[in-house]
Structures are given as C-alpha cells and as structure tokens.
Amino acid sequence: AMVFARNTAMGFNRYADRSIDAMNPRTAQRDIPAGRISARNALWFIIVNALLFAATAAWINFLAFCLSPLALTVLLGYSLTKRFTAWCHIVLGIALGIAPVGAYLAVTGQFAVLPILLTGLVITWVSGFDVIYALQDAEFDRQHALHSIPARFGIRGAIGISILLHLITVYAIALIGSYY
C-alpha cells in the first residue's frame, strides 16, 4: 500500500507542478515538462496507483480501507499548498508523517500513542529538511508568486525556522525514548 500511495503522491506532484517545473531551470528537465512522459499518461499512472492503494488498503484491513481516502487527500493536497501557503513544508511533513500511524493501523487495526508520537517527530523532521531543500528555489518562488518559508521569511529566517523544527525533532526523539 505504501508504494502505491507514494507513487500516487509523487506522480500527482509532478503532474500538478508541470507548468511550474517547466519555468524553473532546476526542474525543467523533469519528465513531464521535458516531454518524456505525457500529462495524460502521468494522470493514468496516478489514477491506477490510487486505485491500487485503496485496493491494497482494503486487503490489509477495513480500518485501513476506510482511512485510505483521507490519506490520499493529504498526500495529494500537499502538491497544491505552495500555491496558497508558505507552510507547505509542514503539509509535506504531515503527508510523510502519517506513515507510522498507517503502518501501525495496517499491522494492528487500532490506534496507539507511540505511532502518533512518531508521526509528530516525522512531521517536524521532514518539514525542517524540506525548508532547507526549498532554499534553492527561494528567488524563483518569489518571482512566480509561489509560497514557501524561504520565499516568505528569507534565507536567514528559513534557516532559523528549520533549526527550530530540527530542535523540536530532537526533543521528540528524547521524549519518545524516555516514554518507551
């Protein structure tokens, strides 16, 4: 299920951003803007993988199946967030952070505290490193009215936010370690 969910999310990100990627020198050679994969074929890839994700989730257990539309909403929604919020990095963290809860639900069919704590840890960790990754596109984002923490707060502000997110991550690791 995880592979199909990731394929869906990655495919949708490339599909949704194809016109943005075509304008950015760093991403212009990605497969869709470069014409190696058609937008239509990318859309089919997304649809097939989303259906396979839902089918696999149903095979795992009923709760996983019931929550699969929510997971897909978060995974696909991330790709649109840079169009309206600088906090898109947090949404990416949430998209990846739901994996520990999803894995635990797949194995046990129930919720527990530890996977929720791990989700929080992954959210701050991924958000922190995505802010660093986004530094390379800060100027492009500003010029094209795209939202990101580096575009909104500048390089120094973004690094400060990334440091804070990483400090929270270290604290979460210590908290989880002392809890278990």
Q: Which positions does each model-derived feature cover?
A:
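Transmembrane alpha-helical segments that form the membrane-embedded catalytic/substrate-channel core
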Residues: 3-11, 73-80, 98-101, 120-136
